[in-house]
């Protein structure tokens, strides 16, 4: 990023136990492998470390939380403020009865496998959701006929001031690919409800999910997952295909030939290439169908060409 005009907030930060980096590259933390730098990137060692930073961070400083970057596009101009990446101690998974408590940094697939081992059905869909539990909560992630609102009993989060909040279904306010939790709040964990099942049956369902993903989606390339949310009563990919966008190229970005609701970095794309391609897809779909597609991929930061 370009140098900030006001660096006072950085001078206020406490000594941390985790890792604090400034002007830190973000591309390595996204599946697209594109984007600019974070003004500050913080990987806290534990909850106390995270709270200590939030308590002194001025409220005007943006806070952005990222996981493994599977459904994320970081713009080329970088991300102002504080980017927080949760891993390690925030990725624990515990089983008690028919409930799994998973840290926000836990991989969705790992949670699904833990449920399988514990003989808890109902969480198999998470094996088809690339990313972490924190991201799944934020966007009410779903796949293969289920979504987070179906299994989430409660969640823990920190508000912008570092206060612990316990969120039930009403506070979470799940809707299609959204939650009502304020931006800037940081999910810490989720309690997920399963139901008794046979590990063999659960494993077979997960294997079927993996097979379908492998056959229908570009899972071994630089992509950000499903690009656009499905409009009510429609499949985004069908609208995109009908608009003639399958295989469409812009710079180093391409609409996947295999599944046209996926955008690809073919090797040398910029974030602008990917975003501009997505906007061109939206324009063509609106022109041909009258339907306005909405981004499902989370776009953060500023464009390099922004005035």
UniProtKB/Swiss-Prot annotation:
It is an enzyme of class 1 (oxidoreductase). One of its GO terms (molecular function) is FAD binding. Pathway: Cell wall biogenesis; peptidoglycan biosynthesis. Keywords: Cell cycle, Cell division, Cell shape, Cell wall biogenesis/degradation, Cytoplasm, FAD, Flavoprotein, NADP, Oxidoreductase, Peptidoglycan synthesis. InterPro entries: FAD-bd_PCMH, FAD-bd_PCMH-like_sf, FAD-bd_PCMH_sub1, FAD-bd_PCMH_sub2, MurB, MurB_C, MurB_C_sf, Oxid_FAD_bind_N. GO terms for biological process: cell division; cell wall organization; peptidoglycan biosynthetic process; regulation of cell shape. NCBIfam families: murB (TIGR00179), PRK13905.1 (NF010480). Belongs to the MurB family. This is UDP-N-acetylenolpyruvoylglucosamine reductase. It comes from Paramagnetospirillum magneticum (strain ATCC 700264 / AMB-1) (Magnetospirillum magneticum).
């Amino acid at each position: 990023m370009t140098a900030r005009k006001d660096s006072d907030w950085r001078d206020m930060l406490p000594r941390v136990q985790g890792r604090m980096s400034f002007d830190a590259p973000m591309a390595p933390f996204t599946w697209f492998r594109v984007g600019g730098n974070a003004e500050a990137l913080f990987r806290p060692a534990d909850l106390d470390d995270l709270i200590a930073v939030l308590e002194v961070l001025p409220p005007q400083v943006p806070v952005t939380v990222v996981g493994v970057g599977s459904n994320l596009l970081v713009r080329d101009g970088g991300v102002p403020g504080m980017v927080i990446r949760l891993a390690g101690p925030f990725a624990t998974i515990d089983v008690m009865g028919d409930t799994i408590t998973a840290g926000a940094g836990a991989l969705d697939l790992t949670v699904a496998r833990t449920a399988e081992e514990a003989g808890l059905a109902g969480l198999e869909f998470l094996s088809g959701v690339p990313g972490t539990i924190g991201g799944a909560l934020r966007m009410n992630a779903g796949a293969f006929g289920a979504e987070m609102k179906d299994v989430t009993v409660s969640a823990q989060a920190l508000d912008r001031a570092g206060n612990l909040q316990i969120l039930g279904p009403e506070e979470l306010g799940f809707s299609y690919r959204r939650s009502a939790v304020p931006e800037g709040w940081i999910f810490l964990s989720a309690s997920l409800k399963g139901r008794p099942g046979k590990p063999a049956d659960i494993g077979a369902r997960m294997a079927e999910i993996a097979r379908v993903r492998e056959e229908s989606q570009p899972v071994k390339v630089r992509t950000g997952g499903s690009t656009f949310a499905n409009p009510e009563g429609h499949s985004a990919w069908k609208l995109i295909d009908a608009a003639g966008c399958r295989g469409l190229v812009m710079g180093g970005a391409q609409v996947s030939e295999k599944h046209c609701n996926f955008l690809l970095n073919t090797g040398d794309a910029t974030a602008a290439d990917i975003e501009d391609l997505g906007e061109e897809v939206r324009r063509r779909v609106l022109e041909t169908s009258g339907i306005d597609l909405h981004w499902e991929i989370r776009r953060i930061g500023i464009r390099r060409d922004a005035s």
